[in-house]
Amino acid sequence: IGSNYIQYMFKKYDNEIRIINVDKLTYAGNLENLKDIEDRENYTFVKADICDADAINKIFEENEIDRVVHFAAESHVDRSIKNPDVFVKTNVLGTLVMLNAAKAAWELPDGTFKEGKKFLHVSTDEVYGSLEEEGEYFYETTPYDPHSPYSASKASSDMLVKSYMDTYKFPANITNCSNNYGPYQFPEKLIPLIINNALQGKSLPVYGDGKNVRDWLYVEDHAKGIDMVQEKGRLFETYNIGGHNEKQNIQIIHIILDTLQEMLPEGDPRKELVSEKLITYVEDRKGHDRRYAIAPDKIKEEVGWYPETMFEDGIRLTIKWFFENEEWMKNVTSGDYQKYYEDMYQDK
């Protein structure tokens, strides 16, 4: 999401802004995501861990930071089940480091904060738990009920940001988004995983009965929403950003397969590989939430944002991007990714 946000911001504001991109470059980080902007004079990349207070404080000391958009997080639920420690460290302690660094840089002697400063914490709808009935939606007032180590770590980080807003009047907002998809998404996530496997004739793993429902948000729509909250959102408020594109996981797979068949040219050998026969049902994920769905009423009413990309259109754009960036996919699915994939799905 961070890569797409940076691309969006430069496309919209060009030379009116300067962006400092801080990334630890874990397994899912890839500098190639931003290679077309790396030579811009108003773009700086800093390799750093958000848990490293000295490194983060140094960035604030050496630069006049007006806004922070805090994307950095461990975000894959399956990984959190196998290794929750990493999620607590990055998502909770890392957020604390970011809050403390921004507070130290922005706070005035009288306890107020410099004009125009804002911290935006990017979070997830998974903190709200699971919905059972159609017609029910997550609102900003929905009580938190996380069910996985990932969602618990994000809920904890949200609470930290809320505590800083309440205790110090720290200038911040929180956004909770639904499932993102689009260019540059690491193929541990459902949509790029299915696209990549289908094109290679590999099995398409589906948890449980495949009827878990997610609300899908095209990543550029999300980037626009974050920018609009930064520009127009009321301080200390939470905004839900959702796509109004609810689909069962098995529906997603069928849509991807149909779209691949439609978009692959005649004579392309991959066309014969793409088949529903690849669908493989595997043991359900532990604590698997049944349904997520966001009500984006507040962000629409207060800042004028709404999702512009229908799911079928977004999938076509996503597949087109993967067709045009096959080398990127080859690079990110080599080495460590193969071991991860085997650990996640081989024995299920």
What are these regions (language model features)?
Residues A55, V86, L93, F186-L190, ...:
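Residue-level recognition of oxygen-bearing side chains
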Residues I37, E134, P187-I195:
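A glycine/serine/threonine-rich, flexible loop-to-helix segment
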Residues N4-Y8, K12, A48-C51, I174, ...:
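C-terminal substrate-binding subdomain of Rossmann-fold SDR/epimerase-dehydratase oxidoreductases
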Residues I1-N180, Q230, T259, R290, ...:
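N-terminal Rossmann-like NAD(P)+-binding domain of SDR-like oxidoreductases, especially those catalyzing
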Residues Y27, P183, G243:
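Short, conserved catalytic or interaction motifs in soluble domains
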Residues N30-N33, N83, F186-L190, I252, ...:
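Residues at alpha-helix caps and immediate loop-helix transition turns in enzyme cores, especially N-
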